[in-house]
Amino acid sequence: LEILAADATTWQAPDALDCIVLDAPCSAIGVLRRHPDIRLLRQSTDIAQTVALQQQILKNLWPQLKVGGTLLYITCSILKPENEQQMQAFFAEHANASELKIEADWGIEQAYGRQLLPTSGQGDGFYYCRIKKIA
């Protein structure tokens, strides 16, 4: 097991990877109740840039995953463009990707992934989508 921090838009693994946990950069809207300063630091125009950055990271990391490997996509956001819509676009572009449903009694199942809302009494707003590379 090797844990590292690097620029995920350009980083290249020396060998194909078994698993990638992508805690993607996001608006952090899901942690707003604990970090109210986010209201002052974010603008609505930031979302499109963040979504584009997420796409760039996914585009760089996906080819580095082994066939049969798993990518876990995570954000601390509750916004659909950063979460479910991001995954819809990803699956539309990658026929070699298959969602591995997260069977859990927490959160709300989405068309792709699982959304945890801050109002559910289980902490902050987070989104999770588990993806298997099938070819």
Each model region followed by its residue ranges:
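C-terminal catalytic and target-recognition region of SAM-dependent MTase-like enzymes
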Residues: 9-10, 14-21, 25-27, 48, ...
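Conserved SAM-binding strand-loop segment of SAM-dependent methyltransferases
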Residues: 1-8
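A mobile, often basic/glycine-rich helix-loop segment
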Residues: 31-49
